[in-house]
Amino acid sequence: MSDKYNILFTPFNIGKQQIKNRFIMGPMGCNQMYDSYGALNNDGIAYYTERAKGGFGAVFLGVAMVDNLVDNYPPTLVENPLYAPGRYKKMASMLVERCGAYGTKVFGEVGMGGGRNSRGALAPSAVETFNFPNERNREITVDQIHKKQECMIKAAALMKDSGFAGVDLHAAHWGYLLDNFLMPIANHREDEYGGCLENRVRVITEMVEGIHQVCGSDFAVTIGLGVKSFITALNKGSLTGENEAGRTVEEAIEIAKLLEKAGVNAILADVGIYDSFYHACPPGYMPKGHALDLYAQVKEQVGIPVLARSRMGDPDLCLHAVESGKVDGVVLARPALADPYFPRKIEMGIPEKIRPCIGCNVGCYGNMVERGIAGGCAVNPRATRELNTRPRKAVNPRKIAVIGGGPAGMQAAITA
């Protein structure tokens, strides 16, 4: 490895959990990685283990929809640890063991989904629904809030018992239910969960405190935080971010301080919500590192690690982000899908061999969210199919000339 990248392979701590380097595989839903009981299946274990083998210091699982009291999410495309806790623990413990063989920590992720992103779903207030401005979501009751919080804490405890190093809260970003609570434009409540900033953040801080109370201080709690919404109104995104009607960076800093005070151990920073999706899940035309300077403003004001998400899939950009002190590490989701060996190739001194994410959003977001089928990647045909598509070594290796660069030609070259 070139000494140039040394800092990216120094350890750091998330709470009391030491991470061996500055590369985090980001949480990203991958359909068909779970069985009908809401537990990881063998495909899911192979998928995450491949990223551990590829050198990531920690892998964050995709979001678990853990509510089975209010919305009762069925364990179909995403995990739900609470449907069959024993089976979940068995498979999750197997993943921890396999990733641990490579020195990689495993974090779960829990979320509530819903909010104004989904038609008819519960939201803090009856405001206009994303993509359907003439419709209004249902206002959640305090009792329903408490039941959902209870499920989140129970799921985190099960993850801790499975050997996970911590849990990430899919909470303060992307405009789902929990994120809606934080924004005055979507939260018009007059009870303890509305009004001033402390009240609006309360729904999250209560869960953070509850998780630490049940799981202990060694179990890390991280959170996704969108540091700027990039909207001028509900259902009106803003490419430039002028006339912000959602979350400003200044308010994100105050939220980050409250989260740190409540016991959050690290922030996974990004930008945008569904209304400005070109920021939340930026395509290839969005510049790499487009939000890095915004994250740096948050890091200056808190004492916990801030990790950069969103178009960070370039080795030199990763180096700049950490070396400059703008953030403490990088969170790679789509780049980890495109090349599970992203960190390893840098460590081996061959960063030019990294298969880059092209930001097409076809096999990842397109398959998993829009079409509800197995995830994939336009530049990595093995992505999410690691268990059954391992390269086979030729019985009699040969040097051959392959005419044509299509799928058949590429497979012939790999096999030879």
Regions found by a protein language model. Give the residues of each.
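Flavin-dependent oxidoreductase catalytic cores
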Residues: 1-403, 407-415
